[in-house]
Amino acid sequence: MYCYTLLKFSASTARTNKKLLYFCITTVNYHIVNYSLMKNLYQKFLASTGVSTDTRNIAKGSIYFALKGASFNGNTFAAEALEKGAQYAVIDEAAYQTSDKMILVSDVLTTLQELATYHRNTLKTLVIGITGSNGKTTTKELIKSVLSQQLNVVATQGNLNNNIGVPLTLLSIKPETDIAIVEMGANHPGEIAFLCNIAQPDYGYITSIGKAHLEGFGSFEGVIQTKGELYDYLKAHQKTIIANADNPITEALLADYHNEYSFGVGKGVNIAVQCLGTQPVTIQFEDASTQTTEEGERVLIEGFTDAPTVATSHLVGSYNFTNIAAAVAFGKFFKLSNEAIKRGIEAYIPQNNRSQLMQWGSNTVLLDAYNANPSSMAAAIDNLLTMSDEKKKVLILGDMFELGNYAAEEHQRIVDKLKNYEWEGVYLVGSNFAKTQSPYPQYETFEAFKEVFPTLSFNNCLLLIKGSRGMALERLIQVK
């Protein structure tokens, strides 16, 4: 009955969405053919120590999934995985099936994703989905830090937020896990919807929507549509959305949807927040009061039900205020005490080249070199302008990747923005910045700038180092 109904629904939409028809039919066939295999594989998973995808760090007793990439074939390492202690190896090429410990499937990646969803559906764990153009990982880590004060929480490791990372996060959930926070990334339309079908989030939050991955999305409108796929899923399943009431773009995605829990600096929100400072970011938060009408409808009213609480973070920059506010909102939604939320915010220390403030000789370095796009680059420059004038300000900016046809325009826009202010020094690194009309020194490659960097004199300066991941500008502070 399930298969017939789904196929009937798919056929009715064929004229308007052939891709959906194909997806539905192939999904049904996959379940029909592989249900018994999946059930058997899941029992093996429960008896294992977990999942491995890399023979360089195989966990003893794990199940090895032989994934493929542009330059590698995991099937070729299946025997090695077993030798190193894997209990089983899941492969999709019969030529490599040399042991009864090797499980042959039609596609290893699809099997990994199906296993993750199967596991997710056997548990009572609540799943939070996080996406956005900027701040996903920082927000995810803040939410984890807050909720972990009173709940058992697992979250995406680092930024493993793609079609492999999301399943791995789900498979790390234990029966005792209360909440799983799943970060979802995308650089093409449809990816967030696909990840939602795997993770099946109960709650969700979009951090921000900016000019990231324009090459894959085609336009800013494409970014909005794709990031909005998280809210589309939540609305279709009547799930709760945590919303930033001060963000007009994400608010527009909600339209008339009422199952939301909001935060913001204005009235008519569940959690009222206020930014008391940005160096570091200090937040004040308090519950907005509600009353219930005779019809049973909850109505937000003015006034507050508890005294304001203030938390001082280890983050800098106004752009991190909403990341912290979102973590506060999740804490309040899940009934954590204000003190627990405060502890969680103040316990989080940024790492991995994300808004890291560090001393480097007589200089202060704001290392924000994990990634960059036009929106986050402009925000970082704006933040530097608000920081103390006691130190001379220097910017070392690297190329912003994946902008496609927008690359020249967006890099020039950043240069034009810089020209509006006085700086002690500006250094532009990368082939895109090298093509701009700029009054500042330009270097075609990181290697070219690395040769010059040791000769530069920085004394009592405030340095902003920011660029896309491929630039790896954090290497500079290991050079001088």
Residues of each region from the PLM?
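Active-site beta-alpha connecting loops in nucleotide-dependent enzymes
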Residues: L67-F72, P350-N353, A369-Y440, S468
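Peripheral docking tails and interdomain loops at the edges
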Residues: Q442, C461-Q478
